[in-house]
Amino acid sequence: MCGSFCTHSRAMEALEQVKARFAHVVPIVSEYTAAADTRFGDAHDLMREMMRICDHRVISTIKEAEPIGPQKLLDLLIIAPCTGNTLGKLANGITDTSVTMAAKAHLRNGRPVLIAPSTNDG
């Protein structure tokens, strides 16, 4: 989950649907999402709710995301919402956030990444 804060409530609904269908769901958020309180919600509350839904700690740092590749932790990585900033970083191989590191680490195993862009660019 990236910092498209106005879409977090819809992303959380989707997370609940994913968790209802799959036993093991690992939540991953950008550092900014993990720390920023906005008019759309409190970061601490969002992290707590993600842990409740997934029954798994939230990955929110590059260091925590790095083992995803070597340990082959995921079958599918969903980035929802994916900001334009994160999308640009992914397109250019920039891995300076927990989400972009998770994607790079996951892709190195030839496994799929599903991206749900959320931008206000039209």
Q: Where does each model-flagged region fall?
A:
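A cross-family phosphate/adenosyl-ligand binding-site feature
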Residues: M1-G122
